[in-house]
Amino acid sequence: MKFNKLSEQNLSGKRALIRVDMNVPLKNGVIGDDTRIRASLPTIEHCLKAGAAVLLMTHLGRPTEGEPKPEDSLAPVVARLSELLGKPVRLIADFHAGVELAPGEVAMLENVRLNKGEKKNNDELGRAYAALCDVFVHDAFGTAHRAEASTHAVAKFAPVACAGLLLSAELDALGKALQAPARPLVAIVAGSKVSTKLTILEALADKVDQLIVGGGIANTFLLAEGKAIGKSLAEADLVEDARRVIAKIRARGGDVPLPADVVCAKEFAETAAAATKNVAEVVADDMILDIGPDAAKQLAAIIAQAGTVVWNGPVGVFEFDQFGNGTKTLAQAIAQSKAFSIAGGGDTLAAIAKYGITDDISYISTGGGAFLEFLEGKELPAVAILAERAQ
């Protein structure tokens, strides 16, 4: 897919409108984690260095359109951004009369989700945004799966529409992992429900050499292979779907390696006693909360041989240390592997942070839903419009 890149644009004296993702956790006006603000800095600084006037826009939370409340304001975000940039950042409540900005200055439009028509991708609002710039820069991969006025309509009407540094890097990394992967391609897909990730599992079944499943998803796959799982979280109605995924991969010469041993408990609790056992020994009141050490070793060996690893989801309840060994072992295997690795999803990022392997993953995706939809092979509307504008 070809799209215009920010790095190719002449920005001297131009007005750059950048759609960033600064939807940070806020409690009582205090930012809980500023990772997303920091992730946007390279694109902002690139535009400033190139001589542009920089206008930013982002959403924050889920406010009601047309009904601004103090807690929906970007004021705390703007204050933090100003600290990080070391320069003032203006917050603009009303942009309809235009925005006066000199090259080297930075301003932020108030929360785009307060604007009527934002969620519905309203063309009139898109035109109003586009009128504020010479170059529109999309740099919010986390919102790329949504067609909204600040991600899609604006890109239709801006004089130039391009991908920012973060979005370009994200698309390059995902393309490398899925469109032309170094083989073997190993995907780790874990989570509580097959139903939420069935389309991903089916899409990956056509691409991967090894599909490692974990969590409640693995329990459903164990059921599909005729194993007893006690009172573990699973979806009995999706057993046939799981069988179909297994058959599809095996028909291509790949596999879904399921654990031969597991770590069980009688209750789901931080204080629960962990018991490691062979899958054949699982009894009616057991809950499987992690893969066993033998399974972890076997999967780590598969990862060690991989050319590409795509990771979405921890394989056990790693928040409780006694059920974290499986995720920790796989995380360390990915960190030590020579494979190109890409990881995404909130729980996955928490596991990466917990086991201190951030610097050992080739690419950490910033997009939750967008990352998953890309894995499914779905077209991301905000990326598709950039490709269209590049023609």
Curated annotation (Swiss-Prot):
Disulfide bonds: none
Pathway of action: Carbohydrate degradation; glycolysis; pyruvate from D-glyceraldehyde 3-phosphate: step 2/5
Entry keyword Nucleotide-binding: yes
Coiled coil (UniProt feature): none
Gene3D superfamilies in UniProt: Phosphoglycerate kinase, N-terminal domain (3.40.50.1260)
Locations listed in the record: Cytoplasm
A GO term for molecular function: phosphoglycerate kinase activity
Organism superkingdom: Bacteria
Reactions it catalyzes: (2R)-3-phosphoglycerate + ATP = (2R)-3-phospho-glyceroyl phosphate + ADP
Record-linked InterPro entries: Phosphoglycerate_kinase, Phosphoglycerate_kinase_N, Phosphoglycerate_kinase_sf
One Gene Ontology term, aspect cellular component: cytosol
Binding-site list for substrate: 21-23, 36, 59-62, 113, 146
SUPFAM superfamilies recorded: Phosphoglycerate kinase (SSF53748)
Main location (coarse class): cytoplasm
Protein EC: 2.7.2.3
Keywords per UniProt: ATP-binding, Cytoplasm, Glycolysis, Kinase, Nucleotide-binding, Transferase
Keyword ATP-binding on entry: yes
Residues reported to bind ATP: 197, 319, 345-348
BP GO terms, sorted: gluconeogenesis; glycolytic process
Subunit annotation: Monomer.
Family membership: Belongs to the phosphoglycerate kinase family.
Protein name per its UniProtKB record: Phosphoglycerate kinase
